[in-house]
Amino acid sequence: MDARLLEILVCPICKGPLSYDRAAQELICNADKLAYPIRDGIPVMLVDEARQTVEGTPVDLNPGSVA
């Protein structure tokens, strides 16, 4: 995911910032607890295509890193 693109993309619902989950190939809106898929390198920013993240379980945005 291009960092410049990530800077301008926002959640289509709340217009808040998104975080990139490299392992899952998703863009995460923490405010709405939604994950938007990235297919063939293209973010799919359609609400109907988003999945809800598990409530109370944080999405690991940096897999493999030591906290």
UniProtKB/Swiss-Prot annotation:
Gene Ontology cellular component annotations, sorted alphabetically: cytosol
HAMAP family, per the entry: UPF0434 (MF_01187)
InterPro entries listed in its UniProt record: Trm112-like
Protein known as: UPF0434 protein Bphy_0537
Family annotation (PANTHER family): PROTEIN PREY, MITOCHONDRIAL (PTHR33505:SF4), ZGC:162634 (PTHR33505)
Domain of life of the native organism: Bacteria
Family: Belongs to the UPF0434 family.
Organism encoding this protein: Paraburkholderia phymatum (strain DSM 17167 / CIP 108236 / LMG 21445 / STM815) (Burkholderia phymatum)
One protein family per Pfam: Trm112p
